[in-house]
């Protein structure tokens, strides 16, 4: 029946002003009931299982139904801080997600599960940041169109509903009054109470006569919340990030939690050293030995006043920085700056310079790079003659 589909609460809006959900099917015409505004099952902090109270005589197929709220400790933790739910124009899912465990259904009977949201009062609220508290800001805005959200698996046998936890993870909240996607329309900065309904799909043709007997409503006070477009209480934001598995990116983005691994500057990986040629490896080892000898000798040398401004070069750079670069293997013939300095050969042999009293030692000239090796041999032969 259209009245059942259009509004979950008669005080919100007349039935003719509320649009039908997009997922309505032929079986829904048999759900000829209208939810009462005040008679529903209330849960308390000490009562995890909802019990029927004040709903009149019920069909045996719904009278024994009991509902348990999942994640109850998390809901209570949010409720102590003042739960906030984001509403957007496109629609936003609830967190914590409304999940229940159902018991006592007829395993062979068909049931439909749905939710609606009722305002807790006729006030509009604002958040005072200096006192971290919600304050009354005035009278409530005009009521939004009342809608109900059918679980997408409805209708289903009681055995299927009781087999697993029922989750309303597809339910979305919006503040768009022109929404045509079937989302629940709420006013921002208003407080709401979710309600859960179990409806027996009566196969009788005159099921409209028994409409008030074929449903049972449940209310969990710890699930009430304030609709907001952005979180007001920073503690709510922190709790949602910490408990929401889909907020993993926010937790990893915290710079304080990044691991700090010290890495040496200008270091060369070990495997790149193995790719060098044997000649370069040998030259690198010799230079490392020379560097260590130079550092040892410098430690024994007394410090000069003019050398106290800057440390020795081998202290500024680690020995590993003197290794040849990997690209030098690609061009074997190219000169390498990292190698030992080579004496430049003279373009022509120098004459044997002699003085009046003595003759200059040719080995000294060769050692200074003034004479090539061939010239050194020639001068030695002449001296022996």
Curated annotation (Swiss-Prot):
Presence of the UniProt keyword Ribonucleoprotein in the record: no
Gene Ontology CC terms, in alphabetical order: nucleus
GO biological process per UniProt: positive regulation of DNA-templated transcription
Pfam families linked: T-box
Transmembrane segments: none
Disease annotated for this entry: Defects in Tbx10 are the cause of a cleft lip and palate (CL/P) phenotype called Dancer (Dc). The defect is caused by a gain of function.
Name of protein: T-box transcription factor TBX10
Organism: Mus musculus
Taxonomic placement: Eukaryota, Metazoa, Chordata, Craniata, Vertebrata
């Amino acid at each position: 029946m259209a009245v059942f589909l259009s509004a979950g609460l008669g005080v919100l809006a007349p039935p003719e002003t509320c649009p039908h959900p997009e997922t309505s099917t032929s079986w829904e015409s048999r759900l000829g009931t209208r939810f009462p505004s005040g008679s529903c099952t209330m849960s308390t902090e000490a009562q995890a299982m909802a019990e029927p109270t004040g709903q009149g005589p019920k069909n045996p197929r719904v009278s024994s139904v009991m509902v348990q709220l999942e994640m109850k400790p998390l809901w209570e933790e949010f409720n102590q801080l003042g739960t906030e739910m984001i509403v957007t124009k496109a629609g936003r899912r609830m967190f914590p997600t409304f999940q229940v465990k159902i018991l006592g259904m007829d395993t062979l009977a068909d049931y439909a599960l749905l939710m609606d949201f009722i305002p807790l009062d006729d006030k509009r609220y604002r958040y005072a940041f200096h006192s971290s508290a919600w304050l009354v800001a005035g009278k409530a805005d005009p009521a939004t169109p009342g809608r109900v959200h059918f679980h997408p698996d409805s209708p289903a046998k009681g055995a299927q509903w009781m087999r697993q936890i029922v989750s309303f993870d597809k339910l979305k909240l919006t503040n768009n009054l022109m929404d045509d996607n079937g989302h629940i329309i709420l006013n921002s900065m208003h407080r709401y109470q979710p309600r859960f309904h179990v409806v027996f799909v009566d196969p009788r043709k005159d099921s409209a006569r028994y409409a008030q007997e074929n449903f049972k409503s449940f209310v969990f006070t710890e699930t009430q919340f304030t609709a907001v477009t952005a979180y007001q209480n920073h503690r709510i934001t922190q709790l949602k990030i910490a408990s929401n598995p889909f907020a993993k990116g926010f937790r990893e983005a915290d710079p304080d939690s990044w691991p700090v691994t010290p890495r040496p500057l200008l270091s060369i990986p070990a495997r790149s050293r193995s790719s060098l040629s044997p000649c370069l490896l040998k030259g690198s080892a010799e230079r490392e030995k020379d560097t260590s000898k130079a550092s040892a000798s410098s430690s024994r040398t007394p410090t000069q006043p003019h050398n106290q401004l800057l440390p020795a070069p081998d202290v500024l750079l680690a020995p590993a920085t003197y290794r040849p670069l990997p690209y030098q293997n690609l061009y074997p013939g190219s000169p390498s700056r990292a190698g030992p300095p080579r004496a430049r050969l003279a373009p022509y042999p120098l004459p044997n310079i002699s003085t009046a009293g003595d003759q200059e030692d040719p080995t000294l000239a060769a050692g200074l790079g003034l004479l090539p090796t061939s010239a050194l041999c020639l001068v030695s032969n002449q001296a022996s003659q």
